[in-house]
């Protein structure tokens, strides 16, 4: 049996009671830490909380070499843990398909997700979001323009864009860095992004939301990670008022 369990947004206490009970009864516990991370805890603290050893998985362990995980699931009760909500990442969906191909039963226990959390924090309505995109750290002279293409297409359709910011080992892209990279893309295409919404540490007691122009937010202090960006489309009056009251939009 392979059960996918979402751990929520920030620390060990975000997991549901159902999820925690399943973890504590599992024979094998795996945690992937490459799509997102719980910044309010660490693996030592999680092991003490779960009363179980936890095997940390790298991207290659899931995408290229999942046999050890699937072998465990074939012979015992196995849980696959991730920050946020399972199946938001396509790699989780692929793993579930691979398990099914081997005849391994699967289940999902959901957790709170950044996808819904940003709507509550920013006041932007969830049905007015289009396709999301990711901004990676540049590699040498390589810097993709595809994130801007997604943003422009969404704005053409009056939709908001959720922009995931890159994570590499212990390096976390900030709102400031993400804006600088998007502004460089926009300058090359000679287009303008009117304003951004930056969100930091969603799910924590120190969560922060700020809205403003690139010039304003590039120098703003968003504090520790994780960060995420929103590029709004056309705003409803209530969305604008919410951003003004809770995110400093002028």
Curated annotation (Swiss-Prot):
GO terms for molecular function: diphthine synthase activity. It holds the Pfam family TP_methylase. HAMAP family: Diphthine_synth (MF_01084). Belongs to the diphthine synthase family. Pathway: Protein modification; peptidyl-diphthamide biosynthesis. Its EC number is 2.1.1.98. It is an enzyme of class 2 (transferase). The keyword S-adenosyl-L-methionine applies. Keywords: Methyltransferase, S-adenosyl-L-methionine, Transferase. S-adenosyl-L-methionine-dependent methyltransferase that catalyzes the trimethylation of the amino group of the modified target histidine residue in translation elongation factor 2 (EF-2), to form an intermediate called diphthine. The three successive methylation reactions represent the second step of diphthamide biosynthesis. The lineage of its organism: Archaea, Methanobacteriati, Methanobacteriota, Stenosarchaea group, Methanomicrobia. It catalyses: 2-[(3S)-amino-3-carboxypropyl]-L-histidyl-[translation elongation factor 2] + 3 S-adenosyl-L-methionine = diphthine-[translation elongation factor 2] + 3 S-adenosyl-L-homocysteine + 3 H(+). It comes from Methanoregula boonei (strain DSM 21154 / JCM 14090 / 6A8). Signal peptide: none annotated. InterPro entries: 4pyrrol_Mease, 4pyrrol_Methylase_sf, 4pyrrole_Mease_sub1, 4pyrrole_Mease_sub2, Dphthn_synthase. This is Diphthine synthase. S-adenosyl-L-methionine binds at residues 9, 85, 88, 113-114, 165, 202, 227. The keyword Mitochondrion does not apply. Homodimer. GO terms for biological process: methylation; protein histidyl modification to diphthamide.
């Amino acid at each position: 049996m392979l059960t996918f369990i979402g751990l929520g947004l920030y620390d060990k206490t975000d997991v549901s009671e159902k999820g925690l009970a399943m973890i504590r009864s599992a024979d094998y516990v795996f945690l992937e830490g490459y799509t997102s991370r719980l910044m309010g805890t660490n693996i030592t603290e999680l092991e003490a909380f779960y009363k179980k050893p936890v095997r940390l998985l790298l991207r290659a362990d899931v995408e290229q070499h999942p046999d050890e995980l699937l072998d465990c699931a074939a012979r015992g009760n196995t849980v696959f843990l991730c920050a946020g909500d399972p199946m938001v990442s396509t790699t989780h969906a692929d793993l579930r398909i691979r398990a099914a191909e081997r005849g391994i039963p699967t289940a999902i226990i959901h957790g709170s997700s950044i996808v819904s959390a940003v709507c509550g924090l920013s006041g932007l309505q969830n049905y007015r979001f289009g396709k999301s995109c990711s901004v990676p750290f540049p590699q040498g002279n390589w810097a993709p323009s595809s994130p801007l293409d997604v943003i422009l297409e969404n704005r053409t359709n009056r939709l908001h864009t959720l922009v995931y910011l890159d994570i590499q080992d212990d390096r976390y892209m900030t709102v400031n860095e993400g804006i600088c990279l998007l502004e460089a893309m926009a300058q090359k295409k000679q287009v303008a992004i009117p304003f951004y919404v930056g969100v930091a540490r969603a799910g924590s007691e120190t969560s922060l939301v700020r809205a403003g122009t690139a010039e304003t937010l590039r120098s703003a202090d968003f504090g520790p990670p994780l960060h995420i960006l929103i590029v709004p489309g056309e705003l409803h009056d209530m969305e604008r008022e919410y951003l003004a009251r809770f995110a400093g939009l002028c």
